[in-house]
Structures are given as C-alpha cells and as structure tokens.
C-alpha cells in the first residue's frame, strides 16, 4: 500500500511522530491517513518552531561570545559536513534530516541518504518500498555546544614596549603597543617608530635597527618582551651605551596609540604646587603622600627636594645658539614646570634653539664657564651659549660680535635701572573715569514715594536716572539702598544693607540701553561669576534680569577700590605691595586654571580691605564685564589704555597672559605711584607706541629705595613677548613674592 506524500512547509518531526503515522497507515484509507497526519503535524508544528527558535538563539549567543564569528562559523560548518558525510556513508533506505547549524542565514534542508528515497526541500519523505521507515536525524548541535566556550576566548595581549633614541640620554622615550596583528612585519614597526620619533625629536634618518638595553640586535617581533625598553638606531648606527632616561616617567603614563600622533610627553609634567598653595608660607606642612611608605620620605630625598625648591624660581634666560656668527639669540622662561632637574632644562633649551646636531649637550655662561648643575641656571648669569656635539673653539666662540652684543642689550632693555633719573615733573596716574549721568527724572517720581526711606531712595536714584519702581521687588523688600560706591561705562554700583541681618552688600545696576549690541558681555559676566568661588574674588549673591536693566547683588568690601587708596597714599611699601600682588596672583591663577581671562584688571576693579591704620589687609578682584572663556586666541581690542598689553594693540591674538601684563603695571604703580608707560596729556597714540616698544625704566629717586627682587618680577611680568612672560603661577613662585614668610599673609 502506497502512502501519500505529505508536504508541510518548514515541518520538522522526530521518530515518534513518524512512528505514529506508520502505525495508523495500514488501518486507514489513504485519505484518512492524510487527514490524521495533517492533524498531528499541525498540532506539533508550533511547538517545533519554538524549539527551533530557541536552538537558533542559543547558537547565535554562542557565536557572539566567540572572538571571530567568521572563523568559528567556518569550523562548525566543516564539522557538520564531516558528520553528514559519515551518516551518508553508513545509512541506507533512511531519511536524514539536517539543519545547517553553521550557516549564518539559518536555512533548513532535508537530504536523502540513498537514491531509493525521494528528496524534497522542507518535506518529510517516507519510503514507499518498505512497510517501515528508518529515520536517522543528524543534528550535531549538542556536540557543537560542547566545543563553544562559555566566555570570550582571550586573544593575545599586545606587548607594551618603550623605545629610546640611540645615544640620547635626555629623551624620555615613547611607549607603544606591539603585537603581530598590528605589525605584520618588522619593517612596519620600523616605519611607525620613525614617524613617532620624528614628531618628538630630530633624527638623522629612518629607524633601521633596534637594540635591547645591553646592545643586542633585535631581529624579530618574537624577541621583544613585554614591559622592557629598547633603543632605536637610525641609518644602522652602532649601539651607544649611555644612561638612558629610564626614570623620566612610569611606563603606564607613556602609552602611544595609533590615533595619538601628538603625545609628546617630554614636557607633560605635573606642575609642582605653588608655595602659597601648599602651606609653606603659613607654617602648615603639606600632607604626606598617600601610602605611608618610607621610600619617598627619606631624609636624603626630602633634602634634595628642598634644595630643588629653593633653587628653582621663575626667570627668563637669554640663549645664544651655536653656529655661524652673528648667531641667533632667543629667550626662554624657566620655572618649576620645565626645570625640575638639570636634564629638563637641557630639554627645554633644545626645543627653543633647535640645533642642527640635535640635542643640546653643553651649555656655557657668557664668560665661557661650563654649566654643570641646575643651580647654575638660576645664579647671577642670565646669558648662555648652547652647543650640541660640534667642536667648541674656546678662543673665538665666547666672543660676541657687535651685532650680537646689541641684540642682547635690546633684550635687557627693561632692566636698565642704573644711572637713570627722572627728568621733569613726576609722572601722574591716569584720571579715574567718572560717569556722566542722564538728566533727572520727572518730579512725579518723587511724589510717588510713600515714606522718608523711599524719599531718600528716590532722590538717590533720581540722580542716576533710575526710578524706584524699576528695582526688582525682591531686592527692594530685602535691602535698603545706600550711597553710590562705584560707576563704569554701563553700570552704577550702590552700597545696600540687608534689612534683617544688617550685612552690607553692593548692588550693581547695568543699563542695557547703553550697551546695545554688547549684551553678550552682560551674559558673560553673569555666567562667569556664577562659576567662581575664591577668597580673593568678589562673590555674586543674586542676579535679576529685567528688560531695561540687569541687577547684581555682590559681596561688599569696605575699603573701596585700589585707585582711591593709591590716590591717598601715593605709593606703598614692598611689604604692602607683596600682600596685594599675592592676592591678585592667586585670583588670576584660579581664573586661568578655569580658562577664564579677566581682560580689565586695573586699580578701579581691585577692592581692598583696610585696618584702622590704613594698611591693606585683603584684596579682591571685581568687575567681570569683559571676562570670557579662552578656547582660542582672542582678537577683540578691549581694556583700559594704561594697562593694555602690546599683543592686544598689535592685534596678533592674545590669551591669558594679558592679565599678567596688567598686574605688572599695577605692581609698578604700587611701588612708585605712576605707571611705567606714560604719554603727555594722556594722549593715546604716544602711549600705545610706548607700550608696543616695551621700553621703560625704574627712575630715581622714586626707585632708589626699592630692591632688585621686585624689579626682576616686574621685568618678567612686562615682557613684550607673551611666550616668555611670566604666568600667574610664576608670580606666586617668584622669590620676591615668597619672601617675608610670617607677616604678609
């Protein structure tokens, strides 16, 4: 009796289902058998599909856990083909149902083991020549699962290798990951090392040889060891056994990846904290480093660190580059950031002078004395010759030509103090600007007042053109209005008092109508002040924005501004000036660390707190109307003429250091009572020409009793070249600022 061929799309059945079909076949007619088989098939199809989906999901999850899905799939397909061939050769008159487990598309197929069977895709075929059916299901899923790991198969970890430049004991080296996957050949490693070294140092050619630290030549990647250091040689140079800079930085801090092409770590050092920040000047010892170990706390190391701190201070040195006369002359700012050791100073000099022979190896003073230790750079000499590996002619090299001598004198022009006497009358301070207020308001405003207090408020506001009803309600109800304590181009400042606590504050009213097109300055001032929290910066208590005015409630300082204090006392002592420059330097350092430039530092914007004898106790920086965040060079010409930096006038772009220039002008004024750059009748053009020239003096008799330390600080703050001008941190680190420990804080 022949059976009808049963077709069902995507039908997957097991031996039990086929057995039930066989058992019912003889007792039923062909049509009945077909109906029963269909019923059974329909009842089980949903269950079988769910099982198939679960198997596929389980297999896909294992595929994702494998490191290489493609390679894993190909291996599984190969294994399944072997199993299928094995069943094909051993089974006869049977149906083999196979699922292509290794296939990424998840298709299913049914294959016949013999020519005596009928084969249809996605169809179960029953042999009509025999009364029974032998079904063999070749499903290697269980066997394959055993071979799939439960976690990701680890790949070979890349080696972290540090490479030095052959014969260069100053170069700190670069660290890169090295693996067979990244570098298929040794030549590829040579090319990458050549590129990386060219970005950091000057090399004579391409890298052609790699040595270990003992001088053994490395010929394959397998010879490299993880965490070890090696030496790169260009143009097949012989190995040079020198003391390489192995202690410059930890290996973990010097990793270079393919995407970091500019990771020059030679000067990427953490700047030591200023003595004004770490407690050295207050008698409070800094906290010890975490870990409690004794290795870094030995008396020997502590004494070395103490000596280094006492030796290194910010200063500008003049460098003469070796070569054909007249030789190039340049300047370099040395400070704790780039001069923690003798080798670091040589590295900094190398980057400035750029010798044809590579690194600077020898440095001499102007008199031909060799510089051999760190303290030599911070002694009495400030002009140095820089040499590489070239031969030195001691008889001729240390003689300056006339042109070289003139160039050095031009650089030293700001230090010309000897024999200079002020001719004519004493220079005067610029006039403090006064605001011309608008005309009085209508008399109806005065009649609207309902109390004597309101009458006084209205009278006061009338003189400024502001109506009492314009004040925000929360300010009017919380504070009582006092006298005018300051004014500017767009704003008026009142003293106000809290009604409940009696504390004094300052109310700054900014007239929006007078700064049309410059509203962004107002927004910037509020935005910047909300970010600030420093003891030497005025705090913002409250801000209220209205259509016509912006109202700012600020911290109040009782002594008024520094301009009025200078007018009263004319000049301050070095001790008093030191206090003020410390506080101003600390405020600028805080601002600059946040990438904010003030752009209008002047005595009118510095508020002071005085004692009963008129001595300055505290200084605070105020008025952030021109302050902004620095993301790139700025070009807007702004500020006050007397305090504006030369790069602003030249419109070549400026940054944070314009604040340092302004602070240098203020320090000069504090000590003598007038600015270094003046012009007759306060004319701007001659004044700007003087600022751009950078030439000023310390004339007698006004400077005859002032020490060289503060003159040196001023000279470094008033450098026309921003690259060598002091930073705000350098001001705090200067030996004059640090002096007189106990009494000036």
Swiss-Prot record:
UniProt key word GTP-binding: no
UniProt-recorded Gene Ontology molecular function terms: ATP binding; protein serine kinase activity; protein serine/threonine kinase activity
This protein's UniProt keywords: ATP-binding, Kinase, Nucleotide-binding, Phosphoprotein, Repeat, Serine/threonine-protein kinase, Transferase
A Gene Ontology BP annotation from the UniProt entry: intracellular signal transduction
Basic and acidic residues bias: start-end ranges: 57-67
Signal peptide extent: none
Active site (record annotation): 600 (proton acceptor)
SUPFAM superfamilies per the UniProt record, alphabetical: Doublecortin (DC), Protein kinase-like (PK-like)
Species whose genome carries this gene: Drosophila erecta (Fruit fly)
SMART domains noted in UniProt: DCX, S_TKc
Protein name: Serine/threonine-protein kinase GG21441
